[in-house]
């Protein structure tokens, strides 16, 4: 019962993380609060991978919903025996937790690549990835950020939002990993009740 409540709490935690991922990813389309750059395709290419909207967002909401349904006591009726049903639900829970790791892991990797690449911005040489060859060194040297003339404050915008996406998807990976460990321990160890009969001791 305790592990089931813990699993439900972890599944519920995925919902706000997914919603925030969607919001943060959407904000990446509006650097400096302007929509003109998205309509003219002047955004970093990693924004178009929909890592926060689709994978760490909508897909994780689906995963969370399925996991919450699987944690419901009323679902242990798919087989003829309760023990069979519990094993079946445990396997399904592990599969969807693994899918959650894959979806959030995708967002984590793409967001990290977007952070290291830097924004697509207008410099003195025109529109380009001004920091693409710096291997992320620009992240710790704010003096280089002045190379981006437009959109205004796009470097800070990208760094903050991609960092938040990395944190959110990282938390999702951790939550799903914990769920896998819980389900593995349940399936390998099982839950046994010890009945001591009078007169044996």
Swiss-Prot record:
<keyword id="KW-0812">Transmembrane</keyword>
<feature type="transmembrane region" description="Helical">
    <location>
        <begin position="158"/>
        <end position="178"/>
    </location>
</feature>
<feature type="transmembrane region" description="Helical">
    <location>
        <begin position="50"/>
        <end position="70"/>
    </location>
</feature>
<dbReference type="InterPro" id="IPR008661">
    <property type="entry name" value="L6_membrane"/>
</dbReference>
<feature type="topological domain" description="Cytoplasmic">
    <location>
        <begin position="1"/>
        <end position="9"/>
    </location>
</feature>
<dbReference type="GO" id="GO:0016020">
    <property type="term" value="C:membrane"/>
</dbReference>
<comment type="similarity">
    <text>Belongs to the L6 tetraspanin family.</text>
</comment>
<keyword id="KW-1133">Transmembrane helix</keyword>
<dbReference type="Pfam" id="PF05805">
    <property type="entry name" value="L6_membrane"/>
</dbReference>
<feature type="topological domain" description="Extracellular">
    <location>
        <begin position="31"/>
        <end position="49"/>
    </location>
</feature>
<feature type="transmembrane region" description="Helical">
    <location>
        <begin position="10"/>
        <end position="30"/>
    </location>
</feature>
<feature type="topological domain" description="Cytoplasmic">
    <location>
        <begin position="179"/>
        <end position="201"/>
    </location>
</feature>
<feature type="topological domain" description="Cytoplasmic">
    <location>
        <begin position="71"/>
        <end position="93"/>
    </location>
</feature>
<feature type="topological domain" description="Extracellular">
    <location>
        <begin position="115"/>
        <end position="157"/>
    </location>
</feature>
<feature type="transmembrane region" description="Helical">
    <location>
        <begin position="94"/>
        <end position="114"/>
    </location>
</feature>
<protein>
    <recommendedName>
        <fullName>Transmembrane 4 L6 family member 18</fullName>
    </recommendedName>
</protein>
<keyword id="KW-0472">Membrane</keyword>
